A protein has these predicted regions:
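Protein-protein interaction and targeting regions used for scaffolding, dimerization, and localization
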Residues: 2-94
């Protein structure tokens, strides 16, 4: 039983990561229009915070929709949000 739980946890995390990447890609253009003029002169930590702040509403809405359409358990919504936000930030700061 323990091995089964570990496998389910690993595959569930992988599924969340894939979904987070898809959600991040789907809202990337909308977020880029909000941050494109401001992050060039910022330090990396400052730019990460700026992107996080400007992307918040868009990402939360997209994650909520994706979670409903993909039957993500409510207990995993916050993890999906965290993974998606990280993907968005990484994509904008590269």
């Amino acid at each position: 039983m323990l091995i089964r739980n570990v496998i389910e946890r690993i595959t569930g995390e992988n599924r969340l990561r894939e979904l987070a990447l898809m959600v991040a890609q789907s809202c990337g253009d909308a977020i880029w229009t909000r941050v494109e003029g401001g992050i060039e002169t910022m330090s990396t930590p400052e730019a990460r915070g700026y992107v996080r702040g400007r992307a918040g509403i868009i990402v939360r809405r997209q994650v909520s929709t994706a979670a409903q359409h993909n039957d993500v358990k409510p207990s995993r919504h916050s993890r999906l949000l965290e993974l998606t936000m990280q993907s968005v930030i990484d994509g904008m700061i590269q």
